[in-house]
């Protein structure tokens, strides 16, 4: 797939605005689906996301990065916390967060007892000392996946 042409196509179809810079694959990205660089306007994308989740999810990530891109060049709020960003992202149907591609093998599986959020860690944590970051509930070790 020609990434640059695909990003230009998504920009025209979903935003009706032209993408005038370059888009690149970046194999070093681990936890993020893509990045926007305001200094020179280029976009980086994680090829592992495309391979793991397919074109539909990848298109939503492209939309997310294009929201940053277009809002920046319109002089509007382009950061995640800005209202303009949240509204345009919702309007075009982009992903707010990248789905996780890390495998839980060889990790400890913790779960919050209140909100049932799952956490995977390589190192064991002291359950008396740490709480859930989302709701402050107590954590419990479900199983060691080693």
Curated annotation (Swiss-Prot):
Residues that hold Zn(2+) according to the record: 64, 68
InterPro entries membership: SprT-like_domain (IPR006640), Uncharacterised_SprT-like (IPR023524)
Species for this entry: Streptococcus gordonii (strain Challis / ATCC 35105 / BCRC 15272 / CH1 / DL1 / V288)
Compartments reported by the entry: Cytoplasm
SMART domains the record matches: SprT
Origin: domain of life: Bacteria
GO-annotated cellular components: cytoplasm
Protein name (record): Protein SprT-like
Family listed: Belongs to the SprT family.
Domain spans labelled SprT-like: 4-142
Keyword field: Cytoplasm, Metal-binding, Zinc
Cofactor: Zn(2+)
NCBIfam families documented for this protein: PRK04351.1
A Pfam entry, by short name: SprT-like
Primary location: cytoplasm
Note on how the cofactor is bound: Binds 1 zinc ion.
């Amino acid at each position: 797939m020609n990434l640059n042409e695909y990003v230009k196509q998504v920009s025209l179809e979903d935003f009706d605005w032209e993408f005038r810079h370059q888009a690149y694959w970046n194999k070093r990205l681990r936890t993020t689906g893509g990045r926007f660089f305001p200094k020179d306007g280029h976009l980086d994308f994680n090829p592992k996301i495309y391979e793991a989740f397919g074109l539909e999810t990848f298109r939503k990530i492209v939309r997310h990065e294009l929201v940053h891109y277009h809002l920046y060049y319109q002089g509007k709020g382009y950061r995640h916390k800005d209202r303009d960003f949240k509204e345009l992202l919702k309007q075009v149907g982009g992903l707010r967060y990248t789905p996780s591609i890390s495998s839980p093998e060889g990790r400890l599986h913790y779960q919050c007892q209140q909100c049932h959020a799952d956490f995977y860690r390589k190192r064991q944590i002291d359950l008396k000392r740490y709480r859930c970051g989302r709701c402050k509930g107590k954590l419990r070790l479900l199983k060691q996946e080693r």
